[in-house]
Amino acid sequence: MEPYSLGEEGALPSEGHLPSFSESQVLNCSDTLNRDLGPSTRDLLYAGLSGLDLDPSLSTSDMPSEVLEDNLDTLSLYSGKDSDSVKLLEEYADSESQTSLQDLGLGALKVPKEADEGGRATGSTRKGKRQHSSPQNPLLDCSLCGKVFSSASSLSKHYLTHSQERKHVCKVCSKAFKRQDHLTGHMLTHQKTKPFVCIEQGCSKSYCDYRSLRRHYEVQHGVCILKETPPEEEAYGDPTHNHDVANQPPPSGLRSLGPPEARSPGSVLPNRDLLRCIVSSIVHQKIPSPGPAVGPSDTEARSSACACPTSLGSSSCTPASTPVALGTLGSEIPEETHPPRKEAATEVFTPVQSRAAENGVPDPPESELESESPRLQRPSSLEGWPEGSSLPACLPLFRGHSVPSGSQPSSHNFQWLRNLPGCPKNKGSNVFMVHKPPAVASREGSEGGGSGPSSTPTSVEPSPSLGTTQEELLPFPPALLKAPGEASSEVRQAAGEDETWAPKKCKPDCESFPWQSPTELGLQDAQNPGGLPSDATPLFRQLFMKSQESLVSHEQMQVLQMIAKSQRIFSHTQVATASAQRPGPEGKQSTLKPLQGPWPPQTLPPAPTVDSFQIGPGHSEPEGSPVRRRKTMPAVSRETSPGGPRRDTKGGPKVASAPPSLTGPGLLPSRNPDSSSLAKGTLDLGDIIPNAGSRQSQLGGDEPAGTQLVGKQGQGENGLASGAMRGEKGPACPRGGGYRLFSGHPRAQRFSGFRKEKVKMDVCCAASPSQVAMASFSSAGPLADPPRDMKSKLTIFNRIQGGNIYRLPHPVKEESLAGGCHQPNGGPTDWMESKSTFVCKNCSQMFYTEKGLSSHMCFHSDQWPSPRGKQEQQVKGQMVASVKRKAGREEGAVEDMKRHYDCSSSEPQDVTILSMLVSSGSCGVTPVVLSSLLQGQEKDGEERDSKESCQYRKRKKRPQPKALFAPPAPSALGEPGPGGCHQSCLHSPVFLVDHLLKGLFQCSPYTPPPMLSPIREGSGLYFNTLCSTSRAGPHLISPVLDQVDSSFGICVVKDDTKISIEPHINVGSRFQAEIPELQERLLARVDENVASLVWKPWGDVMTNPETQDRVMELCNVACSSVMPGGGTNLELALHCLHDAQGSVQVALETLLLRGPQKPRTHPLADYRYTGSDIWTPMEKRLFKKAFCAHKKDFYLIHKMIQTKSVAQCVEYYYIWKKMVKFDCGRAPGLEKRGRRELDEVERTEDKVTCSPRERPTHRPTPELKIKTKSYRRESILHSSPSAAPKRTPEPPGSVESQGVFPCRECERVFDKIKSRNAHMKRHRLQEHVEPVRVKWPVKPYPLKEEEEEEEEELGADMGPLQW
């Protein structure tokens, strides 16, 4: 490329350049990167360019302005063949790429139609050619969120995310979208076919579009698969690109990523295609299996051969090239301590000609990459250029950068990956090394690592052992490799500089190693020169491991699950054995020299024989930076993976138990602890991809005093301890304990398939237990102080529902606190080795992370948590504190969390989610009064077993009943919630009891579930008193709440243990009646009967039939409408007869004239007779209206009528219901109906097959046709009970045996039993339909004239109870 100069803050000298790629360069990468193993290209290349601009003094070719921001949603890293020697890569993959896609079951991707036309259809914001970034057209930032864009079109598209307008509406389902391409993708869901099928075992889901399948993999299986370009997102709209791809077949849907100028040798743009080649070549190496075994893996069939040129001098992007020791670069530089620095050092890929390898140099271990993965992913501070970073020469030079005369630290934070020619076809191979400048001591430099000069310029000089010149070693001047302030970064390379390398040649077929299962990972790359040793595995973390911040972004950590199905990980012993027995390139053991300098020498395992990646020493980020937040990850998290190395007493890694990638020049004290590549600490992949960042520095006791840490965290705070907590970050540490606390770059953490968005987050987090339960889906959020807070990515909830959701951390397991704390000798125990996988309790599916399990449980419950409000408001709105097991510990949360992983105390600290959410000023024992427990805050159905762990195990949610209205109770102990809603008295309460309070709670009474539905309408079932637990609350908590107002509450709990009331027999004086002692039976004769005699037969009623007939007639009159009160007072008539001493005349006079007159001393003086109320027509109409409006809520009916009590309304309803049920046929047309049925019976007589003399026996009469039960009222009214017709039951089978089948309801006779059965359906239908049809009109409110007339007609018979 043409040399470009930087501004005064730049990191590259003016003479630095990258040579143009020769015409003979051909990149032959064997396999398409068909798995989204890491951050997208934009995450790697375009982390932030706010401080860059083009040098106006240099001529540049046309450069699309939106390359840095455009169309990165579906950007994947592909590799492919390029028949044109000028272009590095073409977008359309070769047949091998398609084969690899088909191996995943995804099928060949279709080529976008617009790709051939050079067009692009991603919405109205991209039309025609793009503008060009220039000093006159600077980068634009969003005024709402501060996001930076390179063109106005990208910014206008971004503004759509802040707008609620959705102009594009689906014609099928009317769903609206903000962009046309979103609508186009949505239309795929309406097609009938579902060609995209999930290939996971036991899963047969199919989807109509690729994005849905990818989302299914991410959410359900926790695996990220290949991102397919949506059909609406095509190649760039530059027609000049057509001729470049005209000669190439478009076999798949891999769209062209940029116009030709982005691919040309003289392009000033960072070439993504080269990065794809790099990434593809590295990813598709074989992960060696442990042990000395050299045979191919059983999964070798999955790999595709690398089509490397057969010539010896050719080189490939794959690590099948001769590696060059990093020690050769600057081996003459004096070695010194590399202190961390405030500036964010960057990793740059620096190519090293493989010719250097021919002179014999030791291969560098690639473990240094391991700790750098978060740096490639961390968001830059305001997306600026990093301090002390080196600008790749192949990048466009943006504003604000000029070439400095000397190496000076820049004022930005930026991550960059140097673009290099992938396969220059010269003799030898290229080695890509990640150079990371040393860090300058940050504010906590005394804790970060060793101290030393931080401004010493670094230069890469050829090793004396090399026969090549510096120009031969590097395709660009060595000044490009140094960053301002890089304090002798070559010390990392000094180790093993005298070792020799056997020349390695590319095999003709350039065989690439297949992926192996995690149990087969080993170090047999020596036997396979093209293989990727375990030392190279940090590259996966650096390039392909996204942070676990977003909800379902754990799929990158589980990518090997999709490749190699194995769920197990190899142990420390396997790694140690493999590292000890790993042969060199020529079959002999090659050992790197111990690190030189002030650190104790360590025996280093042999270095890899593949392309090496060198990472400079770490640095301590500013406190506000996301990397600093990741520093708060406890070192214990790294130890959760069994493959992780143990630390010796000095804090250095034990060589016997550490993979070879854990040692070597990269293990320097200045290593940044924030470079933890494990998110959530319990990932099985941590053993396959060892985390060098979590290893202790080899300074040990010889470290400078400045590296020793506060709070007994010397081991954890060392530069290599990726999970160690910073002392001043103590309050946040337990919250994020064991997890990656912040995303790398905000775009690196985006949820696949969703648009990139950011949300500012407040990190002072306090929430109620229910909020914690609802937020347990999300992952650990950033936990730094709010002033230093950075933007983070939205979780899936934000993208689904929109809004801000604040990720609450997962609880720290108690056993992890005990077993995972650092012992005084620095050797943590493997407290999570047996719990490295998480199993869904519903479907038994295994997950590597808690986040994978929690997101999977979302789909079992079909419920997503709603977005949360600001967390400061939650802190103000609720009292949340922690109740710890050791009450004597009164220190502040800051010091307590500093000591969180210090094993000064042998007992496990009872730190639960509340203690992680508590503000920094909370003390040891502060009971929490959760007054909202009775309002159903714990109704999410989550069960957490504190004996096993405190982690969240989401269970399937049960449908919860609605809060029921009940009148407020007179008790003032518990105030009702909004709207007077109380927990049902028929619901057994649920306590969340702390360990200290378990013995204080009395056993709650168990109430069986009600027979009626708790959610039915009406207030009759629930009594208007509070649950008994509200009264018992202050009494129970008073021994604990000495200084807390007991009027708070209902129950004092900690979100620790959920105790539900199991069914049991309630025992006690509250539930059982007191039974008096048994007395002698003789005493019963003396006792007087206290009951009052209200009726007994008088005179000769029992013997004289005439007297009995007169009494029956009195009862019939009393039940008629003649009596005031309405026809149901048989009880009153008998009482009056008793008072009249058996005289029927006196009893009748009492009923008709003056009514029952009883003295106050009479036992029936206040007795209320059923049906004795008189309802006026107005009251009847009001009752009908109220009943139609409120159904059986008689309290509201009473409110509407106002003249009748609730009891009277209930009585009126049930009397009416009884009369409607039995007298529904008593209509004015009753006689007509009787005659009609009689005619039907007579007509059916002709069909009777019995003899004529038997026929009259079964001929029904009008009296028999009327059912005694149904028409009891009419028989009572028109005849005396003694004269009522009596039906004599016929012997069963007497008629059926003779071939006649009469109906038992209406006495119709049928000659076939089937006819009678069909006829019986008529009676069933009438029984259910007639009451509603007759008595309840459709429009009940207006009282029609017909109803009034009917009421008058029925008044004589039914009294006021009829309508």
Swiss-Prot record:
Sequence ranges of Basic and acidic residues compositional bias: 335-345, 937-951, 1244-1276
Family annotation (InterPro entries): ELM2_dom, Homeodomain-like_sf, SANT/Myb, SANT_dom, Trans_reg/Corepressor, Znf_C2H2_sf, Znf_C2H2_type
Cellular location(s): Nucleus
Zinc fingers, C2H2-type class: 140-162, 168-190, 196-221, 838-860, 1301-1323
Disruption phenotype: Females exhibit normal fertility with no apparent defects in ovaries while males are infertile with a small testis and an absence of spermatids and spermatozoa. Spermatocytes fail to complete meiotic prophase. An aberrant recruitment of DNA double-strand breaks (DSBs) machinery and generation of massive DSBs seen in spermatocytes after mid-pachytene.
Domain ELM2 residue range list: 1063-1155
Molecular functions (GO terms): zinc ion binding
Superkingdom of this protein's organism: Eukaryota
Name of the protein described by the UniProt record: Zinc finger protein 541
Gene this protein is translated from: Znf541
